[in-house]
């Protein structure tokens, strides 16, 4: 039995139902295609039906040998459960910068603190929309943040991260057949492709950082 099928103690609900209920109490930042804020949207509404375009980020942390740290989404996740992602991905909340949101998720999900990496840089931003089975969708303007880890130790939270591994970034892009057992999240695949194919759109310092 997977974690997604197990009930939380005393609740009678599965972990996935708990996550859905939690999402229903949270908001994301609705945005234009240019990432200009238009208001707030309920997080569950933003990921069901036709969805709502909203602000998001994905972070890629590298070691000094050019390997990227991939994290597997826990099986309790409603969307892209057990798929492999970049290091972390999520949504900033109202009033929170992309950099601060990224630092928070790195600490919460992987126990990685700011002193372990150099400056987080926003290297790209793109819009995408993808559906996942009959569970929902992502419709995001996604910022890409990158940094190099000088201290590569981490301590993953199993409620959020099912597994983690270091992978040669260039090899993953150029030889995907070698990694076909890894189901990759679409936003990570897009970010990686844009990185290598020269489509990345550098973001000026301080612009919605």
What residues fall within each predicted segment?
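Hydrophobic alpha-helical segments and helix-packing faces
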Residues: 52, 77, 81, 85, ...
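A glycine-rich, hydrophobic loop/mini-helix early in the fold
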Residues: 56-91
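Nudix hydrolase/Nudix homology domain
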Residues: 2-14, 45, 82, 124-209
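Residues that flank catalytic or metal-binding motifs in active/ligand-binding sites
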Residues: 26, 55-57, 64, 88, ...
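The catalytic Nudix box helix
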Residues: 69-70, 85-123
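Secondary-structure boundary elements
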Residues: 62-65, 111-113, 153-155
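Acidic, metal-coordinating catalytic segment for phosphate/diphosphate chemistry
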Residues: 3-58, 62-64
């Amino acid at each position: 039995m997977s974690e997604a099928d197990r009930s939380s103690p005393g609740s009678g609900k599965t972990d996935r139902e708990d996550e859905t209920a939690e999402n229903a109490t949270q908001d994301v930042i609705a945005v234009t295609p240019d990432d200009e804020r238009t208001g707030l949207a309920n997080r569950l509404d933003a990921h069901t039906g036709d969805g709502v375009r909203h602000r998001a980020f994905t972070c890629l942390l590298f070691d000094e040998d050019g390997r990227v740290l991939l994290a597997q989404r826990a099986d309790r996740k409603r969307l892209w459960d057990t798929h492999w992602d970049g290091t972390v991905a999520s949504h900033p909340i109202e009033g929170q910068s992309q950099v601060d949101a990224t630092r928070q998720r790195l600490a919460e999900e992987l126990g990685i603190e700011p002193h372990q990496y150099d400056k987080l840089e926003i290297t790209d931003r793109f819009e995408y929309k993808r559906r996942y089975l009959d569970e929902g969708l992502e419709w995001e303007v996604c910022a890409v943040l990158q940094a190099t880890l000088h201290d590569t130790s981490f301590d993953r939270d199993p409620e959020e991260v099912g597994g983690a591994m270091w992978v040669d970034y260039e090899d993953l892009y150029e030889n995907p057949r070698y990694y076909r057992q890894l189901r990759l999240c679409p936003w990570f695949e897009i970010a990686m492709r844009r990185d290598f194919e020269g489509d990345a759109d550098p973001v000026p310092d301080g612009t919605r950082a």
